[in-house]
Design a protein with these regions (language model features):
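Short, surface-exposed loop and linker segments with low hydrophobicity and enrichment for Pro/Ser/Thr
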Residues: 1-2, 34-36
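Polar low-complexity intrinsically disordered regions enriched in Ser/Thr and small residues
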Residues: 7, 15-17, 34, 43, ...
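A short, exposed loop/beta-hairpin motif centered on an aromatic-Gly-Thr core
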Residues: 13-24
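Short, surface-exposed linear segments at secondary-structure transitions and domain or protein termini
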Residues: 23-34
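Short, mixed-charge low-complexity intrinsically disordered segments
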Residues: 36-69
């Protein structure tokens, strides 16, 4: 199964951030991103993903591919 790391904005909209084949790996990524949010960071920059403005992001979570829309 594929798991999506999804972030939700303060307005309640969910967006796919990344995908992982293992639930544990997806949970680790979501946890690291939530830790980053807790520091007050406003920008995420990754050589694979690119830039993500964190100012409107509420939290990251993991959802099975069957629940993603």
């Amino acid at each position: 199964m594929i798991y999506g790391i999804v972030y939700y904005t303060k307005s309640g909209r969910g967006y796919l951030f990344q995908q992982a084949f293992e639930e544990q790996h997806a949970m680790e990524i979501a946890g690291k991103m939530n830790d980053l949010l807790a520091t007050g960071a406003t920008m995420y920059n990754d050589k694979f993903y690119g830039k993500l403005d964190l100012r409107d992001v509420e939290y990251f979570t993991v959802e099975p591919s069957s629940e993603m829309y």
